[in-house]
């Protein structure tokens, strides 16, 4: 349409309508919301995977809420996955979403500092936290020494569940499985990958 | 398609291709990444790490000194902290993995895109809001005939996007090719030929047989369905869809694009394309028509004739069935259902009226050609249905056909307006709703119309109408009764009607009375109404409210007056008021009698019964109007409450006669036998004896109030009881005192005064008074009082001492002992000169007396013991006799001689007691005393039953008292004697004589 307009402006006298042709003409928005933006940005595949309904209108497999499969490759033996629902997850957002520079060690780019020096300073800005006087390791060992030896049965009825530590005390754990996932070589892998077509799709995507 | 459009399409297509090419080169502008509220992952990791390091160092600093905590508590604290921190790291670990996956899959772009869309949406919304605001502020600004679409084009393009039809506006030569008309025409002709050949090679279904080839296309016309235009391009190509017109409704919007696609597919793929196309279109059209019928029904049911919920339908688009229900409120029409569906045979839409009752031979139940015609079809069905119901009702004979009604939709029903007249009422069925209604209804009719519509079958309806008629008759009668002065009781309600309603008849009771009627008594009008007739039955009944429930206590079952409704008139109602009163009272009396358990029977004056009634009642009635007289026979025994003994005195039945005109109540009775009572009139009893029949008597009372009639009955009963008691006593008296001296001085209901002594002996008005003490039912006792100067007055003491003597005994005793008491007086009469001998009677008991003679001259006294003893004569007969002896034993001669009255003793001993005289006396026995009985146990019986002697004794006078020993009849027992009561007086006088002679 833009082209025809250009023709028009050339052929018609300016006084033809109460519109000033010299003014900037209307241009449609870019990207145009009328277009299929998913296709334009090449997002068809990912959109298909996360769609709530399948192409045939049936309900698609729900997205996972638990991250059980995501931590299977860790060495721990997680019997219960800590979550908000079972009260063992704890609140993380107020810890990680604080953005207060005053509370943090800052590396400053001092004049005359080379880029390498600055990067080094950036990397080492937090090391102080793990060294005296911030962290007195001797004191730590003293305190740990005071705690004496423990036995799992000790914590019965004290509101603490030893299993939550996820220590693989007897060594069985989920090692056989773990190896299996590792052989897949994918961090996205889930234990029943082969069985669920939904997960199959995801894996193939990568 | 026309030729002049073709260049336009070509131009469009080229522009499309151009834009596509343009797009391929086009690199989409980057979508702005979402940054708001987002932190880099590295910062999150660092935050958590710093936090963890600080937490741990804090813990150790706090727990380096033991403080108050036990090692276990510290351990627990440490473990919990570590657990918490570890879990947070777990989450971050998962987060890192997710972030990696998202990055790999370009998922963040999706999020960015979504965010961008949101922003865009927000902007559009803002624009709309701004526009709205502008609109508000520009309320006064107006544009004549605004062409907004063109305006927008001008705004956007600087000029309107008008079709130029290939002309150049500025007049310069166009580059566009124009096709010569000749070429077009040739092409069309070629196409026509081509199509003709092609169609002749194809199999054409019979429905598509009608076609026409023109303008380069084939036009198939199927009547009432569609007009299909097909064409092709050359001999080898299949047919293509060009256009379709619906012949039944041209205005219907069609999705031509889809139809084109579908038909082209069939034409292209199928080996027998036309057949399939027809089938497809036929089905398509049927479905369309079905839908249109649904729309039509919707309009009809919601806004049309049948609006208001009288017609509903259910359109099943899957099964292609429409179920129609009409007359939803009608109950009597049980199935009001039609079904619209496909007829498999004709493959057309058909409507079937599904009513099992309909006669399919005479009435159409299947309808075709529904489209645009559904209203008239439903009209026809409802009309037919109404006719069916009407025919059903006519068959019951309750209704008449309305001859004036040309549409024959109404029924006539007869309802009485007065007793004699009947009016026709039109009952109609509303064809829209199926509900019955009356033509020109009254309030009563309206309320019944509601009930009629509630009835679910013909029988119910007839029943309701029957009730309507009954109600109407009821109100008519009540009105008449009100006007004639009757009082209709609205309160009285019986649990069940007197005449129970049946299937075909209905009954209702009206309870009426007059002002002065006895309470609880009603005239019960029972209306019995059937479809064609109406009868009114009149009864008399007594209705009482017992514990709030009305109960029928008495009902005259025999005399039911039955009359037809049309014979009821005002004059009759008035006459009834007069004539009914007797009956009410009669029934009331009978009811009361029944309540008292007195046997009763109403006597009628009919000729066959007249012989039962005694003549004295008949005679009176000969002159009087028997209408006002009632005679009721009463059982005496039950009337007097079971005193059977009285039956011997009176006849067992009595007659109660009530004369309503004179207000008289009379009770007639009759004695069985003639007795003394009849001759002694007792005025106070006011019992009158009839002249014609001496044994019959009657009592009479004048009644003022009908309610008190029973009072008179009890009065009568009291009198009757007294009468009977009196009669009984009188009879006894007469039988005991069989002397001339006996005379009743005064007779009162409870008192008899009489004389029985000889005139010279009784100075009083009466010698004895008998008071009859009665209680409610019977005679309790007789009080016998002897008068003051009665010589026998001393007996009173002994009578009073011991109660319970039979009055018969007392009377007999009085009569028997009378000579003893008379002896002293008699002695005075016999001796002319003043007597020297005084006689004194002492009474020891009722059986023993002491008689003392004292001679003043000689100065001696002599006493006798007189005893009353009963002597057994034969086995069944007893006789009481006097035994007389000396009080002292004078048998020793010396004792006798010492006594101053020795001479008298000797004489008495010799003449009265001595057995030595017996022989001599026997030989001297006169012929008159021949009946000397055989001597038993040395005692000789001497008969004294000589009437002459009795008369002599009674007539004994002082002048002819020439009595001597020989005349005295007695049995001598040596020292004592026995004699009968008529001999005792002469004997005692003889003793007196002997003693005074000394």
UniProtKB/Swiss-Prot annotation, chain A:
An annotated Gene Ontology molecular function: transcription coregulator activity
Bias kind Polar residues: ranges: 183-195
A matching Pfam family: Rox3
Function, in words: Component of the Mediator complex, a coactivator involved in the regulated transcription of nearly all RNA polymerase II-dependent genes. Mediator functions as a bridge to convey information from gene-specific regulatory proteins to the basal RNA polymerase II transcription machinery. Mediator is recruited to promoters by direct interactions with regulatory proteins and serves as a scaffold for the assembly of a functional preinitiation complex with RNA polymerase II and the general transcription factors.
GO cellular component: core mediator complex; mediator complex
Name this protein carries in UniProt: Mediator of RNA polymerase II transcription subunit 19
PANTHER family: MEDIATOR OF RNA POLYMERASE II TRANSCRIPTION SUBUNIT 19
Similarity comment text for this entry: Belongs to the Mediator complex subunit 19 family.
Main location: nucleus
GO biological process terms on file: regulation of transcription by RNA polymerase II
Compartment(s) where it occurs, according to its Swiss-Prot or TrEMBL record: Nucleus
Region listing for Disordered, in residue ranges: 171-206
Highest taxon above the source species: Eukaryota
Subunit and interaction comment: Component of the Mediator complex.
Curated annotation (Swiss-Prot), chain B:
Subcellular localization(s) per the UniProt record: Nucleus
Keyword Transcription regulation: yes
GO terms classed as biological process: regulation of transcription by RNA polymerase II
Key word Coiled coil present: no
Keywords, alphabetical: Activator, Nucleus, Transcription, Transcription regulation
Any one of the GO CC terms: mediator complex
GO MF terms held by the record: transcription coregulator activity
Entry similarity comment: Belongs to the Mediator complex subunit 14 family.
Assembly behavior: Component of the Mediator complex.
PANTHER family in UniProt: MEDIATOR COMPLEX SUBUNIT, MEDIATOR OF RNA POLYMERASE II TRANSCRIPTION SUBUNIT 14
Role description: Component of the Mediator complex, a coactivator involved in the regulated transcription of nearly all RNA polymerase II-dependent genes. Mediator functions as a bridge to convey information from gene-specific regulatory proteins to the basal RNA polymerase II transcription machinery. Mediator is recruited to promoters by direct interactions with regulatory proteins and serves as a scaffold for the assembly of a functional preinitiation complex with RNA polymerase II and the general transcription factors.
Name of the protein this chain belongs to: Mediator of RNA polymerase II transcription subunit 14
Gene name of the encoded protein: RGR1
